[in-house]
Structure formats: C-alpha cells, structure tokens
Amino acid sequence: TPADTGLLTPLEVEDHTYLYRNEYTLPLGVMVPYDLEDNWQLDITNPADVQNDLAVVLGADPVLEEVPSEILGTSFTFTPEVSGDYYVYVSNKKVEKVSALMGENTKSFDNVNRGYMLELGWITAGEEVTLRNDDNEQDLVAVAYRFIPEGLESVYHVLNRNSMELTKKTDTEITGRIDTEKAGLLYLSIPYDKGWSI
C-alpha cells in the first residue's frame, strides 16, 4: 500500500477519512546551488525528465523510473513488475482525452495535450494497465513511470541539509536563520504576493 513506502505515516481514521503525516515536508527556505537555474533543464518537453534533471542537478537520485510499455495504436499498455505509484506522460499533443483501466478501476483524463503527467495512483505488481485515446484515431504515444520513494528521500535530504529555521512568524512578517555549508541561493517556497519584501 502507499503507506508502506515510508513517505506517509497514518495518524487518524474517522469514517472513511484518513489523516496522514508527510514525512518529507521541507521547511520554508532551503539553500540551492548558485548554478541551479543555469543547469536545470526546464525546457525539456517531458515533465518526468524535468523532475529527474532537477534531482540530478541537486546531486540526488532520480524520482521517476521509466517502465517497459507497449503502444498499440490508440491504446497504450504496461504491466508493473513492482507495486507502486505510477504516472504516464502522453507525448502526442493531438490526444486530448484518455481513459485508464487498472484492474477493476478506471480513471478519465481531459486536456492531456497540455503535457501534464497522468497520475494513475497505486498499482499492484502484475496488474495490467491499459490507456485508451477516447478522443480520435491518433496513436497513444506515451511513456509510463514508477515513482521512486528513495529518490524523493534523496532529494529531501540534499535540500533539508541546509534549511531555514523559522524564528518568528506573524501575518505580516517571517523571520528565520540558516546555516549553510557553502554559498548558494536561498529558495523560499512563498508564492509571490504584492506587498511583501525581503
């Protein structure tokens, strides 16, 4: 199950609602290398390659692993050898709607031509997965990936090694301190909002 990956710790269950703690939550600010923006290849069309490239640039392990698959015209199929979280990237931009059949479960995806990763969820080893182009007669050219929990753990440890400790937090001010092994860029995970200053 997803809980077996060590990424989430179950905290509470009430009716059919589950509460988990994410074990790999980063603090508000972390140090990244000066050359991150120059070396991280953001213009790659496949988002899985962009994520893996970030991991490599940081000096960590990849977070997504390509799995063997087969393109059968308007269908795409694969059978995982390992249980885990699986994703598919459809590279044919003429495909807009895709349905995924995983055992007895189905999922539908719209706007696939926007180039996002299709999150299939947890799939058990040996369970065949079939995706179909529900939109037209275009070939379903795609790539399947398994999420690698150890890769995320590796990225987390690299980023968390030099992280910011909050010393004050109010509605209008955030103060913190950071000790770092070497000079770099301070990355803050605060979305831009007019009125804030550093």
Predicted regions and their residues:
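A cross-kingdom signal targeting lumenal/periplasmic-facing segments of multi-pass membrane
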Residues: T1-E81, D85, K93-K94, M117-E119
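Active-site-proximal, structured, solvent-exposed surfaces of multi-pass membrane proteins
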Residues: A55-S197
